[in-house]
């Protein structure tokens, strides 16, 4: 019996000693491109982060700044929610730089530029071939990120006029440029990117990435608003880019036969859609809070929308007085 006990003790000692490994952690002070980019998957996970910010940027802050400052739309008080008079400030044009919707939009533009520039610089040093990809794909990724930089500067130009122009990723502050300088920078980025981006073919799906046609459409937007941005008429250039799009110069695009083409749940197959965001939320729950913003306070009850809440919905400003007579104001009358 004693011999058996000794054998068991010896066996357990051997088991414990063989199971002891060095569990000391190896600490890294930082994650660098050399340690992170080890596969095709890590490259794409890094690339799409700039695109997820682009998706976030299409939020209510941007919509309300564009609509509630136009004298056509407003958010009136229904119920207890007034949100610290933020909607009234937009209505009467007396907002401050720290107005929540304004602050988030300024931050969103800068964050988008910073992300895209940093991603472009880090991916420029990655050996795509060693990870099973091509140099052509690398060049395409570089131009997609450059187009994202142009997109965010275009949005900043539209909201604020001249923006601080960054050409590389840096923590140093740069002074604010003029609207014309910002316009020229956006144009420069897009003109350089368009010929190097991939063209859409008829068999391609829209999966959120950037192609020639999308960058060309952004350039057309830039030219269309040039007179407002900097007092220069660029309608001829805008018309030419649009005609080139219709003629297929920048890839395969066609107008759909009916409304459901670009707005159905499988619109990634649409011939008309040029840039879209992938979503698995087929019931629209991903953006339900945005839908609430455009409905009446009790719309959820009328439509039996489970999970929706009551919100002060944005609506057209009234064009008629309570007695039915039209208002005489020159602004603020949608019809």
Where are these regions (language model features)?
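Short strand->helix junction
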Residues: 172-173, 229
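Short coil/turn linking the two alpha-helices of tandem helical-hairpin repeats
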Residues: 157-158, 164, 201, 225-231
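Outer-membrane beta-barrel translocator domains and adjoining extracellular loop/strand segments
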Residues: 167-170
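C-terminal motif of bacterial Sec signal peptides marking the signal peptidase cleavage site
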Residues: 17-19
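Positively charged n-region of N-terminal signal peptides that target proteins for export
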Residues: 1-4
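Conserved, well-structured interaction surfaces
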Residues: 41-57, 80-160, 173-184, 190-204
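An aromatic- and glycine-enriched ligand-binding surface/loop that stacks and positions planar moieties
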Residues: 21-83, 191-194, 209-335
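Hydrophobic helical h-region of N-terminal Sec-dependent signal peptides
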Residues: 10-14
């Amino acid at each position: 019996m004693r011999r058996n006990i000794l054998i068991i003790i010896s066996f357990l000692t051997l088991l414990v000693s063989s199971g002891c490994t060095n569990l000391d952690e190896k600490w890294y002070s930082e994650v660098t491109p050399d340690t992170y980019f080890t596969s095709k998957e890590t490259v794409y996970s890094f690339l799409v982060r700039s695109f997820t910010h682009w998706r976030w940027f299409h939020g209510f802050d941007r919509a309300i700044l564009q609509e509630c400052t136009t004298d056509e739309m407003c958010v009136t008080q229904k119920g207890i929610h007034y949100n610290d008079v933020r909607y009234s400030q937009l209505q009467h044009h007396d907002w401050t730089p720290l107005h929540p919707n304004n602050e988030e939009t300024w931050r969103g533009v800068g964050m988008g530029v910073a992300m895209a520039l940093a991603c472009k610089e880090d991916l420029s040093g990655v050996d795509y071939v060693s990870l099973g990809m091509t140099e052509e794909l690398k060049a395409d990724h570089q131009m997609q990120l450059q187009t994202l930089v142009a997109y965010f500067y275009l949005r900043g130009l539209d909201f604020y006029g001249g923006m601080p122009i960054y050409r590389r990723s840096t923590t140093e502050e740069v002074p604010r440029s003029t609207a014309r300088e910002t316009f020229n920078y956006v144009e420069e980025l897009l003109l350089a990117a368009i010929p190097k981006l991939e063209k859409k073919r008829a068999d391609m799906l829209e999966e959120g990435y950037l192609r020639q046609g999308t960058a060309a459409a952004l350039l057309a937007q830039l030219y269309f608003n040039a007179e407002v941005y900097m007092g220069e008429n660029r309608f001829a250039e805008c018309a030419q880019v649009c005609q080139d799009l219709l003629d297929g110069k920048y890839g395969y695009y066609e107008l759909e036969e009916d409304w459901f083409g670009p707005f159905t749940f499988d619109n990634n197959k649409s011939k008309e859609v040029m840039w879209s965001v992938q979503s698995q939320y087929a019931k629209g729950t991903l953006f339900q809070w945005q839908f609430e913003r455009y409905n009446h306070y009790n719309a959820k009850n009328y439509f039996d929308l489970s999970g929706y809440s009551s919100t002060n919905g944005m609506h057209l400003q009234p064009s008629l007085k309570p007695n039915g007579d039209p208002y005489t104001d020159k602004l603020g009358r949608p019809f």
